[in-house]
Amino acid sequence: MDQNSVPEKAQNEADTNNADRFFRSHSSPPHHRPGHSRALHHYELHHHGVPHQRGESHHPPEFQDFHDQALSSHVHQSHHHSEARNHGRAHGPTGFGLAPSQGAVPSHRSYGEDYHDELQRDGRRHHDGSQYGGFHQQSDSHYHRGSHHGRPQYLGENLSHYSSGVPHHGEASHHGGSYLPHGPNPYSESFHHSEASHLSGLQHDESQHHQVPHRGWPHHHQVHHHGRSRHHEAHQHGKSPHHGETISPHSSVGSYQRGISDYHSEYHQGDHHPSEYHHGDHPHHTQHHYHQTHRHRDYHQHQDHHGAYHSSYLHGDYVQSTSQLSIPHTSRSLIHDAPGPAASRTGVFPYHVAHPRGSAHSMTRSSSTIRSRVTQMSKKVHTQDISTKHSEDWGKEEGQFQKRKTGRLQRTRKKGHSTNLFQWLWEKLTFLIQGFREMIRNLTQSLAFETFIFFVVCLNTVMLVAQTFAEVEIRGEWYFMALDSIFFCIYVVEALLKIIALGLSYFFDFWNNLDFFIMAMAVLDFLLMQTHSFAIYHQSLFRILKVFKSLRALRAIRVLRRLSFLTSVQEVTGTLGQSLPSIAAILILMFTCLFLFSAVLRALFRKSDPKRFQNIFTTIFTLFTLLTLDDWSLIYMDSRAQGAWYIIPILVIYIIIQYFIFLNLVITVLVDSFQTALFKGLEKAKQERAARIQEKLLEDSLTELRAAEPKEVASEGTMLKRLIEKKFGTMTEKQQELLFHYLQLVASVEQEQQKFRSQAAVIDEIVDTTFEAGEEDFRN
């Protein structure tokens, strides 16, 4: 073991120098403390046999031979061990879309307890060994659990592994040892909680670099990966992916089982300088924060790394699925052109002593990290562009909507303004019309207008009477025609004024209907005279004109209408109106009796007196004339001459029923109605007279009080006292009180007397009714 270790150390140093020269231009000067050679890798991606894209090695021949010899003895066991014990779960294949020979990147979960114990024993055995030849099949499983516990790795080591086409499911874990040279190692790599996210892009936002000094443990950088998304896309910082990495717009970023946002890894490589790179947005479970996983401070002191590493996996299962990414360049171009894979990996923890095998895997991870970062960045750039377009379109639509809304509001305001203007005009016009109608109503109801119309009606009546004389009509024909036209115009104006003032209620009055009919007849007469002035000698037209002229006699009735303001006339007309139902009933009885007697007389005396009893109508007319008691003796004598002497008892019965009963009933109803109306009128007049007298007395007393002391406002009692003093002179207070009490008693006595009188009147009526009923009973 010791003999083999010497050449192996030399070989490793040579490989380290080669790798240093190979990546010198892409890394920033590290800040490293010797002796702190353990890096914590909480959820590291395990490259299960990912071959190189072109199937060739990038290592020197010596390193390639050495790696092939070391791998040949354990490749089968390593493959088998990683297949059987890779976290106790199947690794989900993940394609990066590079080449068909690309392997699968598994998703990691927490270890089982039994597997943890076995790996802990294996880790102790490998941790104590310092030879490179200590590589055996259990070391592969260390790589699955956390492939670089306490060691840096040489970049470019495992390229020969990928070129050989052997599916390497893990590499040996080298914990300390003679192959870890002391000093700054710019190509050591440390992995975060989830190496599966693989540094989705390079961000150049230098403001996000937090300068965290190395305090004893170079890899304890207090890197807090917060659960919220702090994704800073590359285009937001004004920079793009390096060295021709093509971003596929159709690539998709890996999604989490719990949908947690990407966290932003903040780090610092010693001093703050522009060449530092962020590790992008690492998709990570929010419970796997470095705040919660700082337990690695306690078990990175050259102790059992595997047992302590198991505790960091207890935070929860991490299931990851990666997305397809198409990048046209080979892994060689990604390694040589991308300036940040090694430097970006070294930015998480301090640089440690180099290890030749870890660098190759780290380079492959760096390339996959760049691809994943480019995929995520391209998708987010594309998503942001789409969202920007959508926001612009939405802004345009919003602007158009606001314009349409503004136009609608303006139109609505215009309509509302026009509506308000129309409403205001309508209200104004209605107010003017109402005022005009009120003025016309006051005019038509005024005494002057009534007097003028009454004078016109009287003059028209006198003119109609004068036209009955032939000599006056012939001499004053022209004057009569002129006056008739003037009267006609006055009647038309009166009707129009009343229709305007009263509206349709004008036709609800009988007198108004009579006036309107007379006015209509006058209009027809005037029109016929004007249109047929040359056909005046036509017989039919002449008769029509005579009819209209005779109807002008109805204007005399207007005199009675103008006399309606007289109280007596109003009482008579009111009484007739109230007695009409009773009169109508009596008239129906009279007509029934007349019809019965007509039928009997026609059947009996049709042959004896055919002139009077020929048919039912002539018989009714004959009986109606008998109501006047005219010529009833002639009817009897003619019938007796023809042998119908028995007509006399029938005529007597008819005259008694019709004349003495029914006609007297009509007169009785009218008289009773008139008496009732007169009594009510008298009572009403008496009450009105008493009310007027009382109001007059009260007004006189108030006038005297106001005239005496106009400025003094006295109460009701004071006013009464003053009134008493004026009537009875000066009195003492005791006398005033006694007088006031006396007046109250007198008033109460008068009230009681009034009640007594009313009760006595009721008793008198009852007694009278009783005596009348007794007399009727006695007579019966």
Swiss-Prot record:
GO biological process: calcium ion transport; cell differentiation; flagellated sperm motility; regulation of cilium beat frequency involved in ciliary motility; spermatogenesis
Residue ranges annotated as Cytoplasmic topological domain: 1-447, 501-508, 564-581, 672-780
Major place of residence: membrane
Keywords: Calcium, Calcium channel, Calcium transport, Cell membrane, Cell projection, Cilium, Developmental protein, Differentiation, Flagellum, Ion channel, Ion transport, Membrane, Spermatogenesis, Transmembrane, Transmembrane helix, Transport, Voltage-gated channel
Residue intervals passing through the bilayer: 448-469, 479-500, 509-531, 541-563, 582-604, 646-671
Compositionally biased intervals (Basic and acidic residues): 110-122, 261-284, 387-401
Entry comment describing in which tissues the protein is expressed: Testis-specific.
Localisation per UniProt entry: Cell projection, Cilium, Flagellum membrane
Intervals, Extracellular compartment: 470-478, 532-540, 605-615, 629-645
Compositional bias (Basic residues): 211-241, 285-299, 402-412
Intramembrane segment ranges: 616-628
Renumbered residue ranges of the record's region Disordered: 1-37, 71-306, 376-412
Membrane topology, record value: Multi-pass membrane protein
Disulfide bonds: none
Activity control: The CatSper calcium channel is indirectly activated by extracellular progesterone and prostaglandins following the sequence: progesterone > PGF1-alpha = PGE1 > PGA1 > PGE2 >> PGD2. The CatSper calcium channel is directly inhibited by endocannabinoid 2-arachidonoylglycerol (2AG). Indirect activation by progesterone takes place via the following mechanism: progesterone binds and activates the acylglycerol lipase ABHD2, which in turn mediates hydrolysis of 2AG inhibitor, relieving inhibition of the CatSper channel.
Any Pfam family: Ion_trans
Swiss-Prot/TrEMBL catalytic activity: Ca(2+)(in) = Ca(2+)(out)
GO cellular component: CatSper complex; plasma membrane; sperm flagellum; sperm principal piece
Signal peptide range: none
One function term, GO molecular function aspect: voltage-gated calcium channel activity
Keyword Calcium set for record: yes
Disease tied to this protein: Spermatogenic failure 7: An infertility disorder characterized by non-motile sperm or sperm motility below the normal threshold, low sperm count, increased abnormally structured spermatozoa, and reduced semen volume.
Assigned protein family: Belongs to the cation channel sperm-associated (TC 1.A.1.19) family.
Subunit structure: Component of the CatSper complex or CatSpermasome composed of the core pore-forming members CATSPER1, CATSPER2, CATSPER3 and CATSPER4 as well as auxiliary members CATSPERB, CATSPERG, CATSPERD, CATSPERE, CATSPERZ, C2CD6/CATSPERT, TMEM249, TMEM262 and EFCAB9. HSPA1 may be an additional auxiliary complex member. The core complex members CATSPER1, CATSPER2, CATSPER3 and CATSPER4 form a heterotetrameric channel.
Function: Pore-forming subunit of the CatSper complex, a sperm-specific voltage-gated calcium channel that plays a central role in calcium-dependent physiological responses essential for successful fertilization, such as sperm hyperactivation, acrosome reaction and chemotaxis towards the oocyte.
Designated name of the protein: Cation channel sperm-associated protein 1
Origin species: Homo sapiens
Gene: CATSPER1
